[in-house]
Amino acid sequence: MLRGRSNNESVPYLRLMKYPGAKFSIIPVIEEIFRASECDTFVDAFGGSGSVLLNIPSKIPVYNDINSDLVTVFSAIKHHTFEFKSALTRKVFDILNSSGKEVNPKRGPVSKRDVNAIEKAVNYVVSFSTSFGGMGRTYSTGKEKAYKAYLKRTLEIYDKISKNISSWTIHNMDFRELIPKFDKTGTFFFFDPPYPGKTWYDYDFMETDFADLAKHIKTLKGKYLLTLNSEDETLFDIFGNPTFIRSYENENGKKRPDSKKYRYKAFYTNVKR
């Protein structure tokens, strides 16, 4: 994953862990709209893996997710930077030295063996990064080398990641509480709600949730960008016609012959471009 620079060089995107629905392909669009908004505050309402805030600079970055496990991860990195790195290093080295045995159990409720929030956070990051497709619900074996290289890369860029996260304000709120708290002139909201019908997330969105989000968006004082899969046409009845649609090469399509070559993202915004 590469990001552009003004001198036409490219550098890798910062990425803490594998996670479903990461936004690397649309980060250039998000950054374009955010810059055009001229806002100081960037609120990622459905922050997930943090891929957006990690790669789009803002004066006041705000991370939010309703998943308390994700919030624990970023809070641990922000407030216990070196302790988290030490625990992650030990965990990764244990995995790198494993010899073909299962190294990561299926993700579920945090075990009682996790004696503190740092261990819980490290185990959560590792469980996603060593699972198939970043889904966190299956496990990898020592025969698979890709996730080991991924974890090594995570350690290599950890200092850059933690420095970025140190400036974040981190919240664990429902979007209905979050929006009124931060809505004002100068605030930019990025909304990327869970995809309908997917089982990737611990907290799925119902049609009533989308309807509530649409109501909040209509009364925003600040600026926003909302992204949806354009194939979810039922959502068009809720949000109306998108401001624009973009096509992206389907990475999964390269591996599965039955997949579509391109996927289409619908974007909604009140930012003039």
How would you label these PLM feature ranges?
Residues 1-25, 244-267:
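Class I S-adenosyl-L-methionine
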Residues 2-17, 21-26, 32-36, 80-190, ...:
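SAM-dependent nucleic-acid methyltransferase catalytic core
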Residues 32, 40-105:
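SAM cofactor-binding core of SAM-dependent methyltransferases
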Residues 38-42, 59-60, 165-169, 219-224:
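Short active-site oxyanion
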Residues 45-46, 64-65, 171-173, 191-193, ...:
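Short His-Asn-centered micro-motif
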Residues 53-58, 180-184, 233-241:
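Short loop/helix-cap segments at secondary-structure boundaries that form the rim of catalytic
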Residues 201-205:
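Short, solvent-exposed loop/turn segments at secondary-structure boundaries
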Residues 206-273:
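Long, positively charged, glycine-interspersed low-complexity recognition regions
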